[in-house]
């Protein structure tokens, strides 16, 4: 599946239009030499159903989508809602994408189905209302989520 078909779309009341800035960023990212270093590796992405996490997961999956097994990048998408993840990653479902269903705060207690080489922590509260109405709790959640992600990385010897 071509990333630009599904990722970079902005919905308006009138219609759906491509987000050309995001499409250009994705195309530029797919050319980065760094991606070659991830070939054959497993990357766990927290917040994989959010804008940043989802886009990163799709880029990694798209990069490794060819026939060459040495070029594959396995993505473990850490998500809270499996059904949402299935919808967002429809068309990317392959042996290179698995889910770890949990809240970021409990990630440290989970076990991945394979060795995790790298982790991208993209989970975050995105509701402005939460920041305004419950600032302490919101920051507490962010700190504890990051602590849990770091503990997972330590326990699993993530690079």
Label each PLM-derived region with a short phrase.
Residues 140, 147-159:
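Conserved Rossmann-fold NAD(P)-dependent oxidoreductase catalytic core, especially the SDR/UDP-sugar
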Residues 65-85:
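Conserved glycine-rich Rossmann-like NAD(P)H-binding loop of the short-chain dehydrogenase/reductase
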Residues 22-41:
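A short, basic/flexible loop-to-alpha-helix module at the beginning of a structural domain
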Residues 42-66:
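N-terminal Rossmann NAD(P)H-binding glycine-rich loop of SDR-like oxidoreductase domains
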Residues 118, 145-148:
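Conserved cofactor-binding/catalytic machinery of classical short-chain dehydrogenase/reductase
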Residues 83-97:
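Short, conserved SAM-binding/catalytic segment
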Residues 54, 98-141:
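NAD(P)H-binding glycine-rich loop region in Rossmannoid oxidoreductase-like domains
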């Amino acid at each position: 599946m071509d990333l630009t078909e599904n990722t970079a779309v902005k919905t308006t009341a009138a219609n759906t239009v491509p987000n050309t800035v995001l499409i250009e960023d994705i195309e530029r990212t797919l050319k980065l030499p760094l991606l070659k270093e991830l070939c054959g590796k497993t990357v766990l992405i927290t917040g994989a159903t959010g804008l940043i996490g989802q886009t990163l997961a799709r880029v990694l999956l798209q990069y490794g989508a060819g026939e060459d097994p040495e070029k594959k990048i396995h993505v473990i998408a850490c998500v809270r809602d499996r059904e949402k993840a299935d919808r967002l990653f429809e068309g990317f479902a392959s042996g290179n994408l698995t889910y770890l269903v949990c809240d970021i705060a409990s990630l440290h207690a989970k076990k991945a189905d394979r060795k995790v080489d790298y982790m991208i922590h993209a989970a975050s509260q995105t509701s402005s209302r939460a920041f305004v109405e419950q600032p302490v709790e919101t920051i507490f959640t962010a700190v504890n989520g990051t602590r849990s992600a770091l503990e997972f990385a330590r326990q699993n010897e993530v690079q």
